[in-house]
Amino acid sequence: MHAHLLPGIDDGSPDLDTSIELIRSLQELGFSKLITTPHVMGDMYPNSPSIIRERLTSVQQALIRQEISQELDAAAEYFLDEVMERRIRDNEPLLTLPGKRVLCEFSMLTPTMGVKEMIFEMQMQGYQVIIAHPERYVYLGSNKGFYEELKDMGCLFQLNLLALTPHYGKTVSAL
C-alpha cells in the first residue's frame, strides 16, 4: 500500500501519535500489512534509506509499546528529477516494495526531462518501476500514448482510489 505513515519526514503524518492513529484506522479497515512509502524528493524531502528505516523502527517500537500487532515495512516514493537521475547513475540502492519494485512519481505540472531514460536505467539495474498516481499528471491530459509507452516499457501503475470514481473528472475516468 502506498501511504505516508512515517512521522515528520514528508507531507504525511506530522508526528508519532498521528502515525499510530492512522495505522489503527487502516487496521480497522482490514489492512493486515502496510508498506509506508515516504517521499524522496531533492531538497524538499531529502530522505535517505537510513532516515526512513530509523523512522520505521520508531513507529514499530511505538506499536509494540501500545500492544498493537501490525506488520509494517517501508519503501519510498522517488521523485524523478536531477537528484534521482544522479542516484540512478551512481547506482545507489533504492528502498523498494517486494520484488525490487520501485515507486516513482514525476512533476504533476510540467513534463520531466529524461523520465523514460531514468526508467530504463532503473530497469537495467533490475528494478520494476511503478508509476504512482498517473491520473495526476494534468499536462498529459488525455494523452494515452505516453502511458502506453510506459506500459510497453514494462512499467506498472498505481492509482489513487478516487481515480476510479468521477472525483477527478471525465478525462481521468477515460484514461
What are these language model-derived features?
Residues 7, 42-44, 138-141, 165-168:
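Short, solvent-exposed loop/turn segments at secondary-structure junctions
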Residues 5-16, 103-110, 164:
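Active-site mouth loops of central-metabolism enzymes
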Residues 141-148, 167-175:
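Histidine/acidic-residue-rich catalytic or RNA/ligand-binding cores of hydrolases
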Residues 1-68:
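An N-terminally biased module of ancient metal coordination in phosphate/nucleic-acid-related enzymes
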Residues 4-13, 144-151, 159-162:
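Metallo-beta-lactamase
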Residues 16-23, 84-88, 113-115, 172-175:
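Short, acidic/polar
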Residues 46-158:
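Extended substrate/RNA-proximal surfaces in nucleic-acid metabolism proteins
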Residues 3, 39-40, 77-78, 134, ...:
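Active-site metal-binding loops of divalent metal-dependent hydrolases
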